[in-house]
A protein has these predicted regions:
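A structural signal for short, hydrophobic/glycine-enriched beta-strand patches
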Residues: 1-169, 210
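A conserved mid-domain beta-alpha-beta active-site/ligand-binding segment of alpha/beta enzyme cores
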Residues: 160-211
Length: 211
């Protein structure tokens, strides 16, 4: 067992790799990685949906990178890349994932628009948790989650370096365990080898993104 193979195993576990189909809405979860909104723009241009909601205020990580809420930063990028301004709405007050979904659900309900299907766009390693959380908020809605098409080995960059990403992977597994124990998401079986990788990485000091 080593650090990179352990991280790669967790990365693969956290991704869902769902097939996506045309939907009523693309919901973008704001975060520190602008590649997320690039994926949303790609889906919009391929006509998977003609409306986008971007959700996200200034989170604990993005506040060190952005001067404006995540949703504002992402919207500006989307418009620059060709998305019509009128096709984008933003929610810029949420600072955690549950509130991303709760506040967006209220926006949709208040608009009286009948949204039956949503494509959620997030970071690759957040696919599983995002899907489980969304299911708790968007009842009777067809949900699918997707993310930028990037493998673990190519994901780190100058802003989000390898150590940061590995810390985030460990934090994701911990959140799945804690939120399920608190009945905030449904219980899922975490394979034994993933738990071994998780514990190994914590022993190696990758604990900066733990709750």
């Amino acid at each position: 067992m080593d650090t990179l193979s352990s991280a790669k195993n967790i990365w693969d576990f956290l991704k869902i790799n769902q097939d996506i189909t045309k939907s009523d809405l693309i919901l973008v979860l704001g975060n520190s990685d602008i590649r997320t909104v690039d994926k949303a723009v790609e889906l919009y241009k391929k006509n998977y949906a003609n409306k986008i909601i971007i959700t996200g205020g200034l989170g604990r990580i993005s506040s060190d990178l952005f001067d404006e809420p995540e949703a504002v930063v992402f919207k500006n990028i989307a418009v620059q890349k060709g998305v019509k301004d009128l096709d984008i709405e933003i929610e810029s007050n949420s600072t955690n994932t549950f509130d991303n979904f709760r506040f967006t659900k209220k926006m949709i309900d208040d608009s009286k628009v009948n949204v039956k299907s949503i494509i959620i766009v997030t970071k690759p390693y957040m696919e599983k948790r995002a899907y489980l959380m969304a299911k708790e908020i968007f009842h009777n809605t067809n949900l699918a989650v997707t993310s930028p098409d990037i493998e673990f080995s190519n994901y780190p960059n100058q802003i989000l370096n390898k150590d940061f990403v590995i810390n985030m992977l460990v934090g994701e597994v911990q959140r799945l365990i804690i939120y399920a124990s608190q009945s905030e998401i449904e219980q899922i079986k975490i394979p034994k080898d993933i738990l071994q990788n998780y514990n190994y990485l914590m022993q190696k000091g990758y604990i900066k993104q733990l709750l």
